[in-house]
């Protein structure tokens, strides 16, 4: 029997009694954000709204985005990436589980030197597929010219943020390239790999 989203106690400053809030609401108050599903317009808008709100609330404290995502739609993913670059606080990205496709694109968009992968995380990059856009009819449509422009956009970002040459990134994006956490670090997608059983990073 499903239990729904777990609730945790939270005491507002100046309040004597704690109230029960869902765990994500509580974590958001600590500036911890989660992308734990496919990237679509709904989760994209939620994360963008949270990043903007938390930036207005305090533009000096860093944000932390935990990613466990198989990817998803390109345009909503780019919207998350652009917001991460736009907001004043640094955005740490943390890969736990899988960051594939648009998940890896958002991962690489974290503040350089503040991108982390857990030891057993997996990262996958590839070129955008034609199912990035949902038409009103529910059918997926993409013009070849638009797909090429999107591929160029994603490739430029990977080149800029990984430090790899254009030919290396272009070659990698020809197919599904899966990486371990240490391989993703060597590839420049993350900067740090968490060390098990300690609070240190390598």
UniProtKB/Swiss-Prot annotation:
| Reactions it catalyzes | Hydrolysis of proteins to small peptides in the presence of ATP and magnesium. alpha-casein is the usual test substrate. In the absence of ATP, only oligopeptides shorter than five residues are hydrolyzed (such as succinyl-Leu-Tyr-|-NHMec, and Leu-Tyr-Leu-|-Tyr-Trp, in which cleavage of the -Tyr-|-Leu- and -Tyr-|-Trp bonds also occurs)
Q: Which gene encodes it?
A: clpP
Q: Recorded GO terms, molecular function?
A: ATP-dependent peptidase activity; ATPase binding; serine-type endopeptidase activity
Instruction: Summarize subunit and interaction data from the UniProt record for this chain.
Output: Component of the chloroplastic Clp protease core complex.
The coiled-coil regions, if any, are: none
Q: Where in the cell is it found?
A: Plastid, Chloroplast stroma
What keyword terms does UniProt attach to this protein?
Answer: Chloroplast, Hydrolase, Plastid, Protease, Serine protease
What is the protein named? Answer: ATP-dependent Clp protease proteolytic subunit
- Top-rank EC class of the record's enzyme: hydrolase
Location of the active site: 101 (nucleophile), 126
Q: Which Pfam families match?
A: CLP_protease
**Gene Ontology CC terms:** chloroplast stroma; endopeptidase Clp complex
InterPro entries documented for this protein: ClpP, ClpP/crotonase-like_dom_sf, ClpP/TepA, ClpP_His_AS, ClpP_Ser_AS
Family listed: Belongs to the peptidase S14 family.
């Amino acid at each position: 029997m499903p239990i729904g989203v777990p609730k945790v106690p939270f005491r507002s400053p100046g309040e004597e009694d704690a109230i029960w809030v869902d765990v994500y609401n509580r974590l958001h108050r600590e500036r911890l954000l989660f992308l734990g599903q496919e990237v679509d317009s709904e989760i994209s808008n939620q994360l963008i709204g949270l990043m903007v709100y938390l930036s207005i609330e305090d533009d000096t404290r860093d944000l932390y985005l935990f990613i466990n995502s198989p990817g998803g739609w390109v345009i909503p993913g780019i919207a998350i990436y652009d917001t991460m670059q736009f907001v004043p606080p640094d955005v740490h990205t943390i890969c736990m589980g899988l960051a594939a496709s648009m998940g890896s694109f958002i991962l690489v968009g974290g503040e350089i030197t503040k991108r982390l992968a857990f030891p057993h995380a997996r990262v996958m990059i590839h070129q955008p597929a034609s199912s990035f856009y949902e038409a009103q009819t529910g059918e997926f449509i993409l013009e070849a010219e638009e797909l090429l422009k999107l591929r160029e956009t994603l490739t430029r970002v990977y080149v800029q943020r990984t430090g790899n040459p254009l030919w290396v990134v272009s070659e990698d994006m020809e197919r599904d390239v899966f990486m371990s956490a240490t391989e993703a670090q060597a590839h420049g997608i993350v900067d740090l790999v968490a060390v098990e059983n300690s609070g240190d990073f390598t």
